[in-house]
Amino acid sequence: MRLTVRNIVSALLAVLSPLAFLLAQTPAQQPELPEFIKQGQQLMREGKLNDALALYRLNVQSSPHSTPANIATGMVLDLMGQGEEARKYFSKAIAVAGNPESQAAANRGMAISYAFEGNCDKAVKYEKRVLDFNKSTKNFFQQGEIADEAARICIDSGDFDAAYKWYKIGYETGLKEPGITAARRDLWSFRWEHAQARIAARRGNQAEAQTHVTAAKAILDKGTNPEQAAFFPYLQGYVAFYAGNFKEALEELNKANQNDPFIQCMIGQTYEKLGEKDRALEYYRKASTAIFHNPAAAYAVPFSKKKLF
């Protein structure tokens, strides 16, 4: 396929963010990334963020209107805790984007940048712009995904009212998809129950949280979305943690995705509550080295680094 800025931005996000639903393409359609992006990614995997940053900045200097170079630079700066500087590059990427898709990608990068600082309001401002793009393409599924991402940022930032609002928008919008299948309906229902359980747990409403956990399990047991089963131990561990049941939380979180920096961070928090400082630090170290630019890393990386230093 022809290599375009649009395709490069899409592939860049797909590699750096596991939740890269923006501009999603099938693997067969993914273009070859520019060599400097591949080199930077390898440096990041090796923990050499300074070297990756230098490489990306060099490319911005030589190609100041490169959307991928500006986005990549902003992502690395966020991971390094330099959000204000990162947003200069996301602003540039937004300004120079050559098409609506690339501009949406840059706006999403800006939203995640604010998530690294726990700023729900600012993140939502930019997620709304991405939502508007998906409205223009009448993509209801992507609208729901973006609304859920905004909600995730807000719950992790401690704004539970905003989180509830955006999760509800995500649920209701996702269901508007023309010709939606029963399985897709179940997916949105499972996500909505999952979200309500977490919000209730954070508000200290444990009985309500358990009601939603039970509802989520009932939907999961229908078997229409087997890939969602991996998210259930995370939910059980999350609810148990905020109920103060730390042994149960640890047991469940250990069944969740061990490569997710948010899960690593929660396991660290759980060990800390159990008085096992060394194990807590072990997991905080893991979480602090995440190289994703998504809500999970936006919460886990800054939180874990504060625990380590």
Placement of each model-derived feature along the sequence:
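Short coil turns that delineate tetratricopeptide repeat
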Residues: 30, 64, 98-101, 135, ...
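Alpha-helical segment of the N-proximal tetratricopeptide repeat
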Residues: 32-58, 62, 239
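Start-of-helix register in tetratricopeptide repeats
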Residues: 34, 68, 102-105, 145, ...
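Residue-level recognition of tetratricopeptide repeat
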Residues: 41, 75, 112, 152, ...
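Register position in tetratricopeptide repeats
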Residues: 45-46, 79-80, 116, 149, ...
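Canonical positions in the second alpha-helix
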Residues: 58-59, 92-96, 130, 170, ...
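Canonical tetratricopeptide repeat
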Residues: 72, 105-109, 142, 149, ...
